Amino acid sequence: MDEAPNQGLNVKIDDEELKGRYSNLLRITHTREEFILDFINLVPPQGIVTSRIVTSPGHLKRIIRALAANLERYEQLFGVIQEAPDPAGDGSVH
C-alpha cells in the first residue's frame, strides 16, 4: 500500500462514505487468515462499532507501514503527538 494514490486508479466514494466515521477506540482481533479492525465510537457506558475493516495479514503490514510513514511526516510538520493513556479494560482494545 503506497501512501500516495496510484495515478492510474480511479476511486469512487458514495456520499454516505464521504462523510466519514468518528472513532475514539479501536478493537483488533484476528484469525490465522485475517485481521478484523473494529472502529468504535465510545460514549460510556456504551460503544458502537462505526466501521469494521477485515484485511489479510500481508495487507495489514502495508497499512501499518503507510500509517507509520504518514505519522512521521505529520510529527515533522506539527510536532510530536502526546500519546493518550490506554483505556482500562481487558487488553483487547487498542
Identify what each model region corresponds to:
Residues 1-94:
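Positively charged, low-complexity terminal tracts
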